[in-house]
Amino acid sequence: VSSAASDVYKRQQDYNRWGAIGYDWADPYRGDRVNSVLESKDKFNMEDMINLQIDYFSIPSKQIIELSKGHINNNIEHFEKLSRWNNVLDKNSIEAGIYIEWQTQIYFEFMKEYVPEPVQKYIEVQIYKVIEGISKMNSQQKSLFLDKTFDLAINSLEEKYGEDSSDWVYGQSNYKHVKIFHPLEKIVNDSIKDIIALKTYPRGGDGYTPGSTSNELNQRSGGSFRVVINTKDWDNSFATNSPGQSGNPKSKFYKNLYEDWGNDKFFPLLY
């Protein structure tokens, strides 16, 4: 049994209780990846289940790169990096940095070209619909759209981080990161800010990976409390939480969990 805010009913053809308030689902990719991992073998250990909660494999990246083969004419050396990439949005990955900027450009160009301007600010097209739309383009349309967006992505990366692609690493304070802000942090003096402020940590993933870190460059959503329970030996369970268990900035428990959480480290959950 798995769930990742996606439409689980599509897997149950005999489901007939449709008297719900609404039917809005997340993109299918997180759920699809979870199901793929769970179906890959019969037995899993604690480490496997921890790794699944922080899995950063990007199905959209795999689909977009496959669709683009034979259609990219400029910046070939950067596209070849993506062609050899493992599709994991690792915080230390240059390829992940290239891909996420490209995914962003693809989304905005698709909205600009295919969604009427008067309604653009009122609706949000899910990325699986964008990819579906690209897949239905003819060869010439694909080449024009994908080559244009890839050029925009590379130009944007060069403008933001410089022409040296080694500086395009995905996880960094100016790219994908997490920084939780205290509500008063921006208005208090430095002495108080030093007490209440939390650090910035580089992150991986996005809103379409099982380890969800949102589609904002500063992570805005995703799992804070996560738990893996060993029902045979309860004291061998593991969890994460963030930033701490106390709201008092002077308490040692105010942010003691934040660094490990920001680096995907679990702590023993003793019963």
List the model feature ranges, each with a label.
Residues 3-66, 74, 84-271:
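C-terminal/peripheral segments of proteins
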Residues 77:
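Active-site acid/base region of carbohydrate-active enzymes
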